[in-house]
Amino acid sequence: MKIEHEGNNLRVSEILELNAINASSFRDEVRAAMPAAPETIEIDLSQTRFVDSSGLGALFALYKAANSSHDGVTLRLLNPRPSIQQLFELTQLHQLFEISRTDVDAAKLQTASSKLH
């Protein structure tokens, strides 16, 4: 797993699986890396082959942690494979997370958001 900071933004990538074996350490490492006042947390799922219920729980816990002390934090999931996208839809978590199919979509959203502020 790779974690990068850019100002108050955090990007997590190179996640091969998010399951019962690694979900707790994933959640704890990302939580520890969160900036004091995060604006956007991006989790790139393009390399992720498998997510189970523990992985979903870790993502939800990160969402709650980011938003419990700071309003307006965006947790964006990037490039999930179709099977993982389907899992988000089946569990209705796609209504909670912002999901972008490409990095280009994320850049467009960021540009649009900055024009509003």
What are these model-derived regions, one by one?
Residues 55:
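Conserved phosphotransfer microenvironments
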